[in-house]
């Protein structure tokens, strides 16, 4: 059956609209499935089987709601979160936000660098992992200084397509459909340290605080780069929400299938504790055979190279906006020296964590747990800003946004308090 010219035009228009709408939200969603996320979800599947599948249905609306608030703040104020707080709130709140964000982001950078080093060693065993970590750190720093981030992201996001392999693998394996439906729609909760650690790590690596800053700043820069002053209306808000929802859906879809894949392949193979990247890569063996290591390595390297600039960039934006310095990944080095020096410092600090003796796998999970413990404070700040009419004008939260925001705050705070309680008592 041939397609009529009018139909072709309609399809082209829809595709153009689709590509136009996809922006910061899609990059945010893709970078959320970073090495820390991949390993955390893999650990959840290996340790608990399918018991945490239901968390994807919980985190998608919560993650989308928080990221939408951050994006709306950036659109309306033309500033990132730190810049908005600096203009409208007290400095102690700004410093509190920096205090909660800095260690978690640096640890995440270090864990991702270690993860990239480990998979590099997986491909070339003759070279120690630290060699790859150093090489990738230098490569990233050079790329971020000399190339606009959007060019880097547009190239690297194709490597992240490898993650879609996780969606295929479960269909090559004999599945208990009843168990999948049960664990997807009926929450399983156990009040023990191991379960709560995994739950906090899943929440922390999915609803990651660094993405709050990134989303707001990227939307603000989109506004600043326009030749004409942007009038934020319903159409602009609707397109922004489309972008956010698509990006967050992709992120949570991949996370769901990573748990399903590892909860089937690794858990049923009695691999319940992932200590090495080789073990994590085993989940792809049913589809890829001996190429499983290559696919896993490409996925981790691609997501790591996509996410680390987002992490270090987020930290640089926070510090630059806190102290009123000029900054931005669209600027050249001589235009924003302090901004790029902070990025370099964060990479060096992250790399130095490789020398303290924590295994890359554990570091990736620890980073996710730390995010889970610090996120409630930052969600509270985002909620306050997005409900402040002096800041947001007529674009404050509706009741749905507030309901989802408060639910995210309560769920993450409860999981974090439960984990601390178990650890202490």
Please tell me what each predicted stretch does:
Residues 2-5, 40-43, 68-93, 118-120, ...:
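Flexible loop linkers connecting adjacent transmembrane helices
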Residues 13-16, 43-68, 82, 86-87, ...:
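Extracellular loop-to-transmembrane helix junctions
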Residues 62-76, 217-225, 249-279:
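Extracellular/periplasmic helix-exit of transmembrane alpha-helices
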Residues 72, 76, 94-125, 133-137, ...:
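Hydrophobic transmembrane alpha-helices that form the core helical bundles
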Residues 91, 130-135, 246, 250, ...:
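Loop-to-transmembrane helix boundary motifs in multi-pass membrane proteins
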Residues 98-99, 123-146, 162-171, 335-349, ...:
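Transmembrane alpha-helical segments of multi-pass small-molecule transport proteins
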Residues 135, 144-174, 370, 375, ...:
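Membrane-interface loop-to-helix entry segments
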Residues 161-188, 204-219, 381-390, 415-425:
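Hydrophobic alpha-helical segments and their helix-loop junctions in multi-pass secondary transporters
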